[in-house]
Amino acid sequence: MTQPLSQDQHDSSSNMPTDNAETQGYLSVADYDYDLPDEYIARYPLAERSASRLMYLPAQKENTAVIQDRQFSDLPELLQAGDLIVFNDTKVMKARLFGQKDTGGKVEVLVERLTDDTEFTTDESGQSFDNVALCHVRASKAPKLGQRLVLGDGNIECVMIGRHENLFILSFKNPILPDLEQYGELPIPPYFERHADETDNVRYQTVFHDPTKLASVAAPTASLHFDDKVLKQLADKGINTAYVTLHVGAGTFAPVKTDNLLNHTMHSEYANLPQATADLINQTHQNGNKVIAIGTTVTRVLETAYQKTADEHGHISTWSGDTDIFIYPGFKFGVIDKLLTNFHLPKSTLLMLVSAFAGKANIEQAYEHAVAQKYRFFSYGDAMLLERNL
């Protein structure tokens, strides 16, 4: 499966909140730092997906955080019949490969995105290549143009045919996805400080992923808490579900390297909002019910679609393309009413996003509470249910 990096009919979203970028000259990244004891990082999943804890922050004004400590299994009682939950149905590729350059030096490759865009499949001489992917490459010396890499215990061959920004353009000898599934390793987050194992192959995927949408290098982690039991309880209560797609890139783990977050360049990811999901969202709001985004990836898809397609009534329609939307305090949300998410890394764009949604001071208080109460953090950690700041 290929996803275009860019096509004429596929817009890229705005990288800045349109309502506040011109009025704020400096926002300090240091304001989104916090101290976290290492032992609170969840490096392995719990025995059951829905056994996590759930911190609930009802809608409230800034700096008035009211915090409820719940269990994730309580989620159905915190929502109402007629509400709509929106999931990301992407699947994580076994995108990490290890091997050698033809010179013998060790190399690690992370496949970021498969592409059939001629911008990347044709070199400067006009020669065309098959099975092309944009990849991150780690090696003592970067591979040179035309250099061959042998990966996956000698079972995968590719050649470096170009560069695109910080990515290497590699052409593989054989179709990429089957080889990744057989010889690749699931690219679990770097803060796990370990290699992926058989447990990760199951638990770092959602139970509802679409197997045809095998294109992410990280999981939509808020969705990892859902098991069949919770999904049935939600359905039995009359809570509706819908799906969008965002193929998560390695940029989700990229640190903000500027002191002023307004100078940060957001990574771009392919996203798709189907018309059926847009219709359900519009109908839900028309009925006076709430739209709940399951994770920051869903939030980015829906708010991008709102910027691109909303009419005078706030109704959205189908949209697909690359989104580099950067959500931070001051952003005006147009679609989501509630957000289910995990606890995020210090100084991360995801922490800035939840601060925009629930209020920066409220999130600070919530994270202080989470540390004090020994919540589990990050991808395999506990969850928060946030309601939009009043």
Curated annotation (Swiss-Prot):
Gene Ontology BP terms: queuosine biosynthetic process; tRNA wobble guanine modification
Keyword Cytoplasm: yes
EC number: 2.4.99.17
Cysteines paired by S-S bonds: none
GO molecular function: S-adenosylmethionine:tRNA ribosyltransferase-isomerase activity
Keywords tagged on the record: Cytoplasm, Queuosine biosynthesis, S-adenosyl-L-methionine, Transferase
Region: Disordered, residue numbers: 1-22
PANTHER family named among the record's database cross-references: S-ADENOSYLMETHIONINE:TRNA RIBOSYLTRANSFERASE-ISOMERASE
Protein name per the record: S-adenosylmethionine:tRNA ribosyltransferase-isomerase
